[in-house]
Regions:
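N-terminal auxiliary "cap/dimerization" subdomain that precedes the catalytic jelly-roll/cupin core
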Residues: 1-101, 306-321
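Non-heme Fe(II)/2-oxoglutarate
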Residues: 18-20, 232-321
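Catalytic micro-motifs at enzyme active sites that drive phosphoryl/nucleotidyl and oxygen chemistry
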Residues: 21-23, 89-92, 128-132, 147-153
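A gly/proline- and charged-residue-enriched helix-loop-helix capping module
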Residues: 107-142
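A short beta-loop-beta micro-motif enriched in histidine and acidic residues
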Residues: 137, 150-160, 207-208
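Conserved short histidine dyad/triad with adjacent acidic residue
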Residues: 141-155, 174-178
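Short beta-strand His + acidic residue motifs that chelate non-heme Fe in jelly-roll/DSBH
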Residues: 151-154, 171-172, 222, 228-238
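Double-stranded beta-helix
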Residues: 166-221, 226-227
Length: 321
């Protein structure tokens, strides 16, 4: 497998691991595209290793579960307890049962997986930074499920290399610039207020998506705020091979940070002054002015939030505490 030759990675087995972008003659950080990789062979990404990872993440509330019966149109809400109260050991013992679903969030909090994320990004770093310098805050999310299962429609702040490790899944992705799918106001609300309440799937959106039917060794790259969702159908599953495992490798850059700051300032213009400001990227000269102002707005919001939290009354400690 060809990789970014400036930074190859080698696992304990001697195998060289990486994401192969050479299948894309014109890879761009601003465009959705398919890709190939071989991280499905990495020892840390096999199901027994992931069960051990889940045991380590569970006390940190980094194992997430969805309620039964969700659809792609459901709100993307999740909890740190299984809806039936199952332990992590039981979750993995029964992971091939239809509609089983667990996500391992922020795997980078475990040092060996933080190192793995660095290896994955090193295999593409020079290609990414040709367009978007200063990669930072690399995070990882692993989704483990048995069909029929879905991940609801949503957007993320980060750019995303999405890698299929085991089983099959269909990933549907829309352009982040398609305002008929997610309005600029909804994107701003997500960036500023962390809310997905106005990011909801409608069946009329489906024809406008790019669909990727992926198996082990396949993947998809999509830019920040690209609407996306997944589904896994039962037709590929057989006893002993009925689990889908996907790895979202997320990262920020100077470009995503700049866009977020423009969204922050646009929110002030829209809500406070009733303006209809240009979205990030539509007016680069204005973005140059908005971004530092948005940085100030964001810092002020965080400070105000911290002050409000500290001012909330707390229960008095018991006598003698």
């Amino acid at each position: 497998m060809k990789m970014d030759q400036t930074s190859p990675t080698t696992g304990r087995t001697g195998t060289s691991f990486g994401i192969d972008l050479d299948t894309q003659d014109r890879f761009s950080t601003s465009k959705i595209c398919s890709l190939k990789h071989n991280f499905h062979q990495h020892p840390l990404l096999q199901l027994p290793a992931l069960e051990q990872l889940a045991r380590e993440l569970d006390p940190l509330h980094k194992c997430r579960f969805v309620r039964p019966g969700i659809t792609q149109a459901s709100g993307f809400s999740h909890a740190d307890r299984h809806p039936e109260g199952r332990s992590i050991e039981e979750v993995f013992r029964r992971i091939e049962e239809p509609a089983s679903w667990v996500a391992l969030y922020n795997v980078e909090v475990i040092p060996r997986y933080r190192a793995l994320l660095g290896e994955i990004m090193d295999s593409v770093r020079s290609r990414v930074e040709q367009e978007q310098p200063d990669i930072f805050l690399e995070t990882g999310f692993i989704f483990i499920s048995a069909p029929p299962s879905v991940t609801p429609f949503h957007i993320d702040r980060e750019n995303n290399f999405w890698l299929q490790l085991q089983g099959r899944k269909t990933m549907s992705v829309w352009s982040p610039a398609d305002r008929s799918v997610v309005s600029v106001e909804a994107v701003e609300e997500f960036i500023v207020a962390h809310s997905l309440r106005n990011v909801r799937f409608k069946e009329a959106f489906r024809p406008g998506s790019q669909e990727f039917d992926v198996g082990p060794g396949d993947g998809v790259y999509f830019p920040s705020t690209s609407p996306h969702m997944t589904r896994s159908e039962p037709n590929w599953a057989i006893p002993g091979d009925g689990v889908s495992v996907s790895f979202g490798v997320n990262f920020y850059t100077s470009a995503t940070r700049r866009a977020a700051r423009v969204h922050q300032f646009n929110r002030v213009l829209r809500k406070g002054l009733n303006f209809s400001p240009a979205a990030p990227g539509q007016a680069p000269v204005l973005d140059t002015l908005k971004a530092p102002l948005g940085h100030v707005v964001g810092a002020a919001r965080r400070l105000a939030g911290a002050v409000l939290r500290s001012a909330r009354p707390t229960a008095a400690p018991p006598p003698g505490a």
